[in-house]
């Protein structure tokens, strides 16, 4: 999937050019990578770019969000389990480490791992082997691990909630992703990219943004980063009836300068109101 490589990272700002160079430099190695950045900056896109630019590109890319599952389920999800190892384990199941064999395992929100799972992950990083839950057979895997977090892990290390040895095992190569407000010159390119994507996905004619609207989008703080920008562009494409999206068409929270101080938590993915959409189209 060449479109998941470096060329799929949109932007020509100095920060993005540096990021792309970093990815090209490390793609050929097997070193563990720690990707850091605020929520919505595109950490999985960067992990995919690393994988699909590497010699492992024809092998699996497997993604796990460490925060999305409770610790008991996550352990079985990562390491797999043997038949009968717990209630409901009616068959042997291979975990994500085995599924990613030969390829890349992406561990998102790695700062959320429990101390017990941190120990198990450390062992895999050191020895490239593990046992399934309820099993005794050692399984060896050849995988590259790319981890990501939107937290600063060092304070967690100092507080004793994140293992120092695991931190250094993960942080062999560190790739920080800049927030959108630090690469504003990329915003017009991203708007065009997301507008084209949303038009194709929704089966509607392409639309453009007026210069005034683009200038306003480029000046906004984007606390939710690229994810928030993509939501706003899609909302405008679906709701605005004309061919050109103007400043007045932008959502109120984007037009309102005070909205720049809203927390990213408040800016949830857009929920389209079908009745409102039809009313505006008519």
Where are the regions that the model predicts?
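Conserved post-Walker A coupling segment in P-loop NTPases
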Residues: 8, 21-87, 98-114, 142, ...
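Bacterial C-terminal helix-turn-helix
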Residues: 231, 267-282
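Short gly/ser/thr-rich secondary-structure transition/capping motifs
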Residues: 67, 84-91, 127-132, 155, ...
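Dynamic helix-loop-helix/coil hinge segments at AAA+ ATPase domain boundaries and subdomain interfaces
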Residues: 2-20, 72, 272-277
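Nucleotide-binding/hydrolysis machinery
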Residues: 2, 6, 12-15, 54-59, ...
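Intrinsically disordered or compositionally simple regulatory linkers and C-terminal tails
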Residues: 259-268
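A short beta-strand-to-loop transition that corresponds to the Sensor-1 phosphate-sensing loop
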Residues: 109, 147-152
